[in-house]
A protein has these predicted regions:
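A glycine-rich dinucleotide-binding beta-alpha-beta segment and adjacent secondary-structure elements
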Residues: 2, 159-234, 240
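Glycine-rich loop(s) and the adjacent beta-strand/alpha-helix scaffold that form part
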Residues: 1, 9-75, 227, 246, ...
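Hydrophobic residues on conserved beta-strands that form the core of alpha/beta folds
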Residues: 6-8, 81
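FAD cofactor-binding and catalytic pocket of flavoenzymes
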Residues: 45-165, 196, 218, 225-232
């Protein structure tokens, strides 16, 4: 409206036009769609930073195989190693190693199409799977934008990948030292789009950020962004609990 506040949101639901009016608006569509909604609406972007600093973590899936024993686990995602999170031994941070859900032979075949299931089944039965996660750093060139039809486009290149390579090497060393003679890797690229964050960065300076430290838009005092878009950096952990904790924090600050 004339005062700069958001008066209503319009869209479609089940093919029908929809309009919602309100006193306060909270946006939590995920970092990509939050940026797209703001860009399509032409709001909250006096800084020109909406959509920039897109981050998705540097991730690699590892399958480690020990031919001497089978892995009969049901719920494998039960452990996380943070020994290298703050320091990789060189004074600089690394990341986290975490168990992930048990991989089956049919899942392996999607990445090894020519391999017969008769070979993959004993491999899957003797494998243990880990996720190696390190921080990707915010780069203004990594961004969400819209094409001429208003569709989302992603511009992205890896950042801070040397730290990822170091943690991968450490993971291989540890696993082989524990008797896992074969270690296979699947490096995630942008198609995985994991843990997206950072497209509506928080900060105190309206010229250098989209929302303030309470996740309120610098441009519209009744608009809050409460998903991972506000992240100034990505860290090297799953972001869901941080998103939830911050949303609860912001909810307590919103005027009743």
């Amino acid at each position: 409206d004339a005062s700069g506040r958001i008066a209503r949101a319009t869209g479609h639901a089940d093919g029908e036009p929809l309009e919602v009016s309100g006193r306060l608006f909270g946006l939590a569509a995920g970092a990509a769609n939050t940026a797209a909604l703001l860009l399509r609406s032409g709001i909250a972007n006096s800084s020109g930073l909406v959509g920039t600093r897109y981050m998705v973590h540097n991730n690699t899936h590892i399958a480690a195989i020990d031919p001497r024993r089978t892995n009969d686990v049901v719920f494998q995602k039960t452990a996380c190693v943070n020994d290298f999170y703050d320091d990789m031994g060189d004074g600089y941070p690394g990341g986290t190693l975490q168990l992930i859900g048990k991989v089956q032979a049919s899942m392996m075949k999607t990445h090894a199409r020519r391999a017969p299931l008769s070979m993959l089944k004993p491999m899957a039965a003797r494998s243990m799977e880990w996720l190696v996660m390190t921080e990707d750093t915010p780069d203004p060139a990594n961004r969400i934008s819209l094409d001429s039809q208003g569709r989302i486009t992603v511009s992205w290149t890896r950042t801070n990948y040397d730290r990822h390579e170091l943690l991968l090497a450490k993971a291989r060393e540890l696993l082989k030292g524990a008797g896992y003679v074969a270690v296979f890797e699947q490096r995630f690229d942008i198609s995985m789009n994991s843990h997206m964050c950072g497209t509506a960065v928080a900060g105190d300076d309206p010229r250098a950020s989209v929302v303030d430290h309470d996740c309120r838009s610098h441009d519209h005092d009744n608009l809050y962004v409460v998903d991972s878009a506000f992240f100034p950096s990505s860290g090297a952990q799953n972001p869901a609990l941080t998103i939830a904790a911050n949303a609860l924090r912001v909810a307590d600050l919103v005027p009743a």
